Structure formats: structure tokens, C-alpha cells
Amino acid sequence: MAEEITDSPAPWVADHIRRFVETGGNPRPGTNDLLLTTRGRRSGKLRRTALVYATDADRYVVAASNAGADRNPAWYLNLVADPDVTVQVGALSRPARAYPAPAAERSRLWQLMITTMPSYQDYQNTTTREIPLVIIEPSGAHARRRDRPMTSGRR
């Protein structure tokens, strides 16, 4: 039996997750949305949230904006404690590793994120903390790209 996943306690996020699941991963056409499942750092339970993402090569980038609040979101604290996550983009769900973006990449990735969703700059302007950026690398993405292209059907 699959382990139970608890959706975000924020009603608007839980509603967004529900729409994401119901539409097969396309709740807001024209917007890059993904579902991120982390393991609760205290509870050990699986926790799921919906986030806007940008792509950087074969990686996804998300902002731990918490809508400009002065504290990091719980999902960010969870992945710092345990970087093994599940990411769902569209109908495809797969294991991944998630980690805070290194300082050397931050400026470039921040520009990518505010191009994707300009309101992130407004969020940054309303808080005293630096909004963390998170890189999500699907498991096997690098090996698949280097070794051979994905194909459909039998090998």
C-alpha cells in the first residue's frame, strides 16, 4: 500500500493541488506548475505542495517565497533536512533530489525565476530574508541524457 500524502494545510494551495491532480498536471494553462512532495522533518510524513517552476537544462528551479513572509516555508525546511523528494510535472511523477541553489548560481537563477513569475520580486521586496531558490534534479536525468535518448516501446 502506498504511503499517504498530506497536502498543504493552506486552503488555496490544497485547492490548487486538487486541480493539478484532476487535470493531469495542467491546472493553469500557460503557467509552469509542479507538485513537490517532501518528508516532514518532524513528523516523517509525506507532505505535498504546488509551486511555480522554471527550467534550467534538465533541472527545475523553484522559489521558497512563502508569498513574501518573513519565514521560510515548511516544504523548504523539510527538503533541507531530507533532499530526497518526489516531483510531478504534468502527469509524470518521479523521484528527485532537491537542494538550495549555490550562491554562484543564485543571480542567474533569480533572473530566471522573476522572468517566469515577476511577483517573486515583489515578494522579495516585502521580506527581510533572502528568498531561497531550490534546484530539483530528477533522479536519473543526467544519466539518461548522457547515455541514450528516451524511447517509447521496447528496446
Predicted regions and their residues:
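A generic local structural motif
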Residues: 21-23, 48-49, 121
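Short, solvent-exposed coil/turn segments
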Residues: 29-31, 46, 80, 129
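Extreme N-terminal tail/first-helix region
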Residues: 1-32, 142, 146-149, 155
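N-terminal short leaders/motifs
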Residues: 1-11, 38-40, 84-93
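Short beta-strand segments
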Residues: 31-67
